[in-house]
């Protein structure tokens, strides 16, 4: 009899508890607030709540886990994440929000921007840093071009400035002499570092320290040893010539741009930037050897060619804009790089100063860059 009474009591208690929980559940579904504590609430806290983390681009400093109450969202049991509607006002920014991203891109397109389709959030892009030098000695040769070409032919300025710099990782490898060679061309003049033996360089083109027991500086920074300059070069020596031919036909201006490249150089990452009058939309490109991009904010049309070599020493582009004065398409800026130089300065060998020592292994980088190259 006692056992039967206890069983009936437990059944009645469970029924009351079930009714109570259903009432509390109804309060939650209607937006009510419950102060009940106990196992049921603890279970609900862990099963029905998900933590929203903010990214690096959020407005809370460096980002990370946001512990504000508004960044927590609850899902009723039995619903999948795809069926959840509405979000807390403080939920962190979703980097994959397709709707907002598309709206942003469409607004840029309306302004005339040419949008690259492989858009990625900048906070998630990995930026690879250049690899540190692996050889004990690294030689860096670089020439920079400062050129102003007249639109009707001839040059206002054609200046070439070069530098040979040395990077030595260890002091033990700094006791060396560098044998260099260069092309004998008119207008080429050298200037050595004050700590370089000038007589040795002028007589034998050997770079060595003025104090023979003093090694070249070591570390992670390059040390310039010699500089040079080439002046008096003419238009026939230009690595790249660019001509612009605008003509007005009716209510439109047809602009033909052409380039011709010298056989002396293979040019990499060529960008020809043509200024345009203020436009309401992107210019209409009718023909192009390469690719183009329109910068609506600066009103500049960029013509890019990945590589100019023996297969494409010349190329052209044609585009159409509303009527404009021919002077609006100048100055044209040109950028490129090459793996050889005008002077052909390079290190041909390294000799250790200590007798019986082996010369350290070295690598060499040679580069020509258009620092300021314009058609005016």
Curated annotation (Swiss-Prot):
InterPro entries: AP2_Mu_C_sf, Coatomer_dsu, MHD. Disulfide bonds: none annotated. Residues 134-376 form the MHD domain. Oligomeric complex that consists of at least the alpha, beta, beta', gamma, delta, epsilon and zeta subunits. It is a peripheral membrane protein. It is found in: Cytoplasm; Golgi apparatus membrane; Cytoplasmic vesicle, COPI-coated vesicle membrane. This is Coatomer subunit delta-4. It comes from the Eukaryota. GO terms for cellular component: COPI vesicle coat; Golgi membrane. The coatomer is a cytosolic protein complex that binds to dilysine motifs and reversibly associates with Golgi non-clathrin-coated vesicles, which further mediate biosynthetic protein transport from the ER, via the Golgi up to the trans Golgi network. Coatomer complex is required for budding from Golgi membranes, and is essential for the retrograde Golgi-to-ER transport of dilysine-tagged proteins.
């Amino acid at each position: 009899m006692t056992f039967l009474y206890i069983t009936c009591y437990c059944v009645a208690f469970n029924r009351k508890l079930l009714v109570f929980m259903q009432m509390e559940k109804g309060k939650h579904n209607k937006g009510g607030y419950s102060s009940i504590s106990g196992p049921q609430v603890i279970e609900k806290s862990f099963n029905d709540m998900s933590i929203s983390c903010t990214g690096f681009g959020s407005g809370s400093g460096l980002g990370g886990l946001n512990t504000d109450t508004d960044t927590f969202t609850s899902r009723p049991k039995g619903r999948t994440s795809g069926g959840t509607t509405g979000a807390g006002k403080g939920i962190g920014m979703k980097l994959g929000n397709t709707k907002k991203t598309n709206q942003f891109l469409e607004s840029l397109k309306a302004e005339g921007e040419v949008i690259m389709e492989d858009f990625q959030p900048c906070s998630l892009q990995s930026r690879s840093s250049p690899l540190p030098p692996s050889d004990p000695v690294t030689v860096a040769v670089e020439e920079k071009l400062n050129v102003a070409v007249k639109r009707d032919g001839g040059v206002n300025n054609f200046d070439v400035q070069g530098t040979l710099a040395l990077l030595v990782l260890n002091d033990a490898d700094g006791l060396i002499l560098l044998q260099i060679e260069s092309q004998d061309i008119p207008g080429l003049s050298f200037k050595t570092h004050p700590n370089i033996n000038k007589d040795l360089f002028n007589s034998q083109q050997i770079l060595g320290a003025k104090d023979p027991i003093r090694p070249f500086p070591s570390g992670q920074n390059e040390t310039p040893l010699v500089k040079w300059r080439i002046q008096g070069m003419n238009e026939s020596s230009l690595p790249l010539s660019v001509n612009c031919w605008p003509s007005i036909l009716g209510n439109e201006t047809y602009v033909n741009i052409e380039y011709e490249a010298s056989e002396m150089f293979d040019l990499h990452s060529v960008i020809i930037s043509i200024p345009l009058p203020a436009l309401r939309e992107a210019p209409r490109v009718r023909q192009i050897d390469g690719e183009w991009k329109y910068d609506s904010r600066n009103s500049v049309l960029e013509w890019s060619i990945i590589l100019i070599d023996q297969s494409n020493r010349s190329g052209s582009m044609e585009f159409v804009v509303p009527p404009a004065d021919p002077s609006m398409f100048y100055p044209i800026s040109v950028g490129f790089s090459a793996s050889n130089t005008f002077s052909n300065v390079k290190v041909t060998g390294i000799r250790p100063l200590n007798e019986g020592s082996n010369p350290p292994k070295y690598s060499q980088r040679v580069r020509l860059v258009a620092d300021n190259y314009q058609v005016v």
